[in-house]
């Protein structure tokens, strides 16, 4: 399959990766994958590769398409970026690119406080220490995964245990290594036939020919060539700054860099990946992503300062939760990101906007537009499908304004437009609980979210029929994602409530309950103190809801794929 920059996912175009990719040695792809192939072969056949098989694998990897090599290197750099502490990532790029004097770059330790080991993109079950990976990637030294004991840290290194700065890592050379280096040098010089080395006395003795056997498949010239060649050389895809498709919020809009990528990214052919964009990195007007301290771009805020604007790491994933999930305003407000007040090339007409990086809601199965359910956004904010709430508004207060209160003691709480409305089928995997309608007087259907299709079991131990009860308790052992327990700890929790009579097929204590024309039926209360709903079973007798005084254990489950018909209750 032909890979190109257009095929790569967004996380492979982070400026951290774009700045470091030209400094990755070409030997890294061949070396890591060759060791993985040898490991897989040994596990499968319980014997080592022959020299001919290993040489064939080496030639295959060396002749691999450049786009595949770059894609592999981009993914590995993205993985290494997460293993480096956030406050050291900028220093790492500046030192590797030669724009700053080498300093310590600390990595995140493992559970034992030692340096991490990674599998280099799940290549067999072989793991490599981070400092080994750095030496192979940026210095092109072909080390084995067991050569960690040969690595030594520079005397200037302040934390040798966790530092992954390539300039602080050296390889200890033993006497045997020096002897072999001299032997190989003399052997190559003797084969060159130059007059200066034609003296037989200077040639290596003949007995040395039988003393060493080369176990690898690389010769000296191949090793030198691939260790000195960047992985981006001769590929035709050298990631020029003017042609790199990048996210608009990675760049300073004052720099005048021509960006050609919009917010939307083409879908990947593989499994969905998490796109981590928790750090902003700015290019300079000259095209460098990391300006030197003397450049004009460095006079603004640093990368670490810009990270503070992003209150929390922002991840964009495939929607796996309901649009209005059980979240609090403290959980949702840090996700809002303030963008620079400049024109965004990927978004026409964006200016002075505050938008959230949450994913848009999934397609709604309802027969009416979902947009009509959401409260209208203020006109001073950019209208975008990912917009949630402005940072100065409380999501709970916003939704609470549209939920009419219900007084159990009031005999009538009728609402106009009380005709029943059929809600679409509930999917088996998930359906979000819908938000209240902007119009308080309108009838709003309630869609229940259930994870399986087992019969309904409603256990209401200790229920006492009391129509005037206003406080409910539920046991703490309630099953997650099945129902929500009410708690009297928060008085505002029971402030807003609305009763609905829902017709469904139930199974209680082994007998089926069907919707009947009698006056006694079952229903639920739907309380919305913010962005989530709690379901409480109740009974309606003579058009009067009878709420349980003490609900200890209860659960609701829909059978199959029912239709829920919402009606208003008096």
Swiss-Prot record:
Biased composition (Polar residues): 324-340
Motif residue range(s): 9aaTAD: 397-405
Gene disruption phenotype: NFIB knockout results in failure of lung maturation, and severe defects in development of the corpus callosum, specific midline glial populations, the hippocampus and the pons. GFAP expression is reduced in brains of NFIB-null mice. Conditional NFIB knockdown in the telencephalon results in significant enlargement of the cerebral cortex with preservation of overall brain structure and inter-hemispheric connectivity.
Low complexity: bias regions: 408-421, 464-474
UniProt signal peptide: none
Effect of residue 131 to G: In strain: NIH Swiss
Tissue specificity: Highest expression in lung, skeletal muscle and heart. Lower levels in liver, kidney and brain. Very low levels in testis and spleen.
Positions of region (Disordered): 252-446, 455-474
Residue positions, PTM Phosphoserine: 264, 292, 295, 312, 328, 333
InterPro entries noted in UniProt: CTF/NFI, CTF/NFI_DNA-bd-dom, CTF/NFI_DNA-bd_CS, CTF/NFI_DNA-bd_N, MAD_homology1_Dwarfin-type
Transcription regulation is among the record's keywords: yes
GO biological process, one term: forebrain development
Function: Transcriptional activator of GFAP, essential for proper brain development. Recognizes and binds the palindromic sequence 5'-TTGGCNNNNNGCCAA-3' present in viral and cellular promoters and in the origin of replication of adenovirus type 2. These proteins are individually capable of activating transcription and replication.
Family, as annotated: Belongs to the CTF/NF-I family.
Protein's name according to its UniProt entry: Nuclear factor 1 B-type
Gene this protein is translated from: Nfib
């Amino acid at each position: 399959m032909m890979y190109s920059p257009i095929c790569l996912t967004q996380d492979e175009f982070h400026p951290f990766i774009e700045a470091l990719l030209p400094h990755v040695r070409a030997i890294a792809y061949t070396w890591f994958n060759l060791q993985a192939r040898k490991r897989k072969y040994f596990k499968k056949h319980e014997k080592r590769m022959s020299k001919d098989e290993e040489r064939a694998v080496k030639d295959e990897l060396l002749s691999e398409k450049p786009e595949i090599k770059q894609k592999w290197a981009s993914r590995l750099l993205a993985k290494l970026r997460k293993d480096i502490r956030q406050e050291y990532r900028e220093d790492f790029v500046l030192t590797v690119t030669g724009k700053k004097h080498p300093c310590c770059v600390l990595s995140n330790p493992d559970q034992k406080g030692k340096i991490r080991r990674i599998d280099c993109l799940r290549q067999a079950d072989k793991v490599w220490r981070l400092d080994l990976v750095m030496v192979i990637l940026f210095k092109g030294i072909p080390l084995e995964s067991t050569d960690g004991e040969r690595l030594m840290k520079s005397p200037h290194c302040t934390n040798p245990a966790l530092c992954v700065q390539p300039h602080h890592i050296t390889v200890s050379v033993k006497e045997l290594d020096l002897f072999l280096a001299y032997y190989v040098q003399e052997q190559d010089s003797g084969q060159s036939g130059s007059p200066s080395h034609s003296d037989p006395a200077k040639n290596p003795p003949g007995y040395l020919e039988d003393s060493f056997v080369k176990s690898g498949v690389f010769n000296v010239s191949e090793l030198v060539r691939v260790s000195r060649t960047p992985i981006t050389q001769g590929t035709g895809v050298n990631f020029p700054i003017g042609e790199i498709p990048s996210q608009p919020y990675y760049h300073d809009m004052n720099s005048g860099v021509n960006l050609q990528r919009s917010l939307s990214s083409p879908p990947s052919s593989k499994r969905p990946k998490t796109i981590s964009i928790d750090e902003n990195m700015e290019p300079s007007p000259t095209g460098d992503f990391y300006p030197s301290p003397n450049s004009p771009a460095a006079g603004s805020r640093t990368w670490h300062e810009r990270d503070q604007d992003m209150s929390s790491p922002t991840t964009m994933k495939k929607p796996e939760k309901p649009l209005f999930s059980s979240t609090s305003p403290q959980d949702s407000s840090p996700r809002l990101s303030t963008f620079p007040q400049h024109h965004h090339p990927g978004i026409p007409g964006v200016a002075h906007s505050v938008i959230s990086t949450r994913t848009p809601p999934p397609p709604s199965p309802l027969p009416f537009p979902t947009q009509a359910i959401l409260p209208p956004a203020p006109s001073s904010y950019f209208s975008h499908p990912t917009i949630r709430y402005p940072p100065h508004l409380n999501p709970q207060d916003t939704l609470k304004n549209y939920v009419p209160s219900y007084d159990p003691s009031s005999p009538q709480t009728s609402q106009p437009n009380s005709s029943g409305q059929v809600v679409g089928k509930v999917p088996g995997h998930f359906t979000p609980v819908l938000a209240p309608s902007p119009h308080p007087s309108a009838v709003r259907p309630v869609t229940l979210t259930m994870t399986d299709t087992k019969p309904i079991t409603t256990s209401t131990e200790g229920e006492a029929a009391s129509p005037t009860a206003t406080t409910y308790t539920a046991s703490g052992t309630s099953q997650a994602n099945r129902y929500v327990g009410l708690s009297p700890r928060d008085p505002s929790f029971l402030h807003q409530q609305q009763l609905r009579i829902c017709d469904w097929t139930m199974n209680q204590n082994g007998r089926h309950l069907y919707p009947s024309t009698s006056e006694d039926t079952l229903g639920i209360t739907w309380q919305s103190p913010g962005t989530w709903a709690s379901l409480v079973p109740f009974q309606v007798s003579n058009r009067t809801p009878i709420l349980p005084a003490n609900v200890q254990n209860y659960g609701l489950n829909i059978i199959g794929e029912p239709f829920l018909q919402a009606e208003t209750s008096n």
